[in-house]
A protein has these predicted regions:
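Extracytoplasmic
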Residues: 4-11, 23-309
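Compositionally biased, intrinsically disordered low-complexity segments enriched in Pro/Arg/Gln/His
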Residues: 14-21
Length: 309
């Protein structure tokens, strides 16, 4: 604007605009900084900082790929359903059941075969499911007795090679497998059993302190009350040493050894000890007239060919 002296003075109208921009920048910066601090503070309490690991152990998954190399492409694998899709995806091989078919009657019989102490029964169940499947189960389900008789006396032989594929996750899932497989189809009800992993802070030749219990290895007693029937040392899926305590009944301690170190201690009852899963997968004990071991990748997995041909 002009003054009375004919001179002009500089305009100050742009100063408020500059100040407004500056204040706006300060507000935005403060907002973003505050949000950043907020998310940093809560990240430890939420899933933001959580990076999930693989759902299948990489060591176990590597054995899927090895199985693919060792069996004919037209083979079928009897295993637990949880990894059915993953196994088929990795190997191209068929499985007896998977996440889409775990509610079928096959699942009951597979579970029954795994927890059975009779390797003949697992052999018969596998043969029946491979040749008759759910259709045969439905046709013979006129009574519980008739169905069990049909499954235990299969008439046909499988055309394609059949394999049993045990995987380490089945140890942790044994309780669920046992709950299904022990179902009494005549009277109803089941008696689930499982593996109890013991956390030990002392192991000597004479005693063990595990999960708050004192285990006397001379007398074969837990807390001087519960009897132990045997103790088994396992390395690479084979029995390294077995010690009997002289009790007619009792629990079994299974100690898994890697190198010279005890890496896992399991407490199980007699039915779990005698189960096909425990005997074949963990102890490496199997009927050579019925099964042939094809691949031992213990502690991750183990593969057996069922001798039908």
């Amino acid at each position: 604007p002009e003054t009375g002296l004919g001179a002009t003075t500089p305009s100050t109208s742009h100063f408020p605009l500059q100040t407004s921009h500056y204040l706006n920048w300060i507000r935005q910066g403060t907002l973003y900084l505050g949000m950043g601090v907020f998310f940093w503070l809560i990240s430890g309490q939420t899933a933001i900082s959580f990076v999930p690991g693989p759902s299948i152990h990489t060591g176990l998954y590597a054995t899927f790929l090895e199985v693919k190399k060792r069996v004919p492409g037209n083979s079928a694998l009897l295993t637990w359903w949880d990894y059915g899709y993953a196994i088929t995806d990795a190997t191209g091989l068929a499985t007896f059941h998977d996440g889409g078919g775990q509610t079928s009657p096959k699942t009951y019989f597979i579970a029954r075969g795994l927890i059975s102490s009779d390797q003949d029964e697992l052999y018969d169940i596998t043969q029946y499911l491979a040749t008759e499947g759910n259709r045969g189960i439905a046709e013979n389900n006129t009574s519980p007795e008739a169905l069990l008789a049909a499954v235990r006396n299969p008439k046909l032989k499988p055309w394609d090679p059949i394999y049993l594929f045990f995987t380490a996750d089945m140890t942790g899932k044994y309780g669920a497998i046992s709950k299904l497989g022990s179902w009494d189809i005549v009277k109803g009800g089941s008696k689930p059993r499982g593996y109890q992993n013991m956390v030990c802070n002392k192991i000597t030749n004479e005693e063990m302190n595990c999960s708050g219990a004192k285990i006397d290895l001379k007398a074969g007693k837990i807390n001087n009350r519960v009897a132990l029937k045997r103790m088994v040392f396992i390395r690479d899926g084979q029995v390294l040493r077995e010690q009997a305590f002289g009790h007619a009944q009792g629990y079994t301690l299974q100690l898994l050894v890697a190198g010279q170190q005890i890496v896992e201690v399991q407490l199980i009852d007699e039915e779990v000890f005698r189960s096909n899963y425990n005997q074949m997968f963990l102890l490496g004990r199997y009927r050579e007239d019925l099964y042939e071991e094809t691949y031992n990748a213990f502690p991750f997995s183990r593969l057996f060919r069922v001798k039908y041909q």
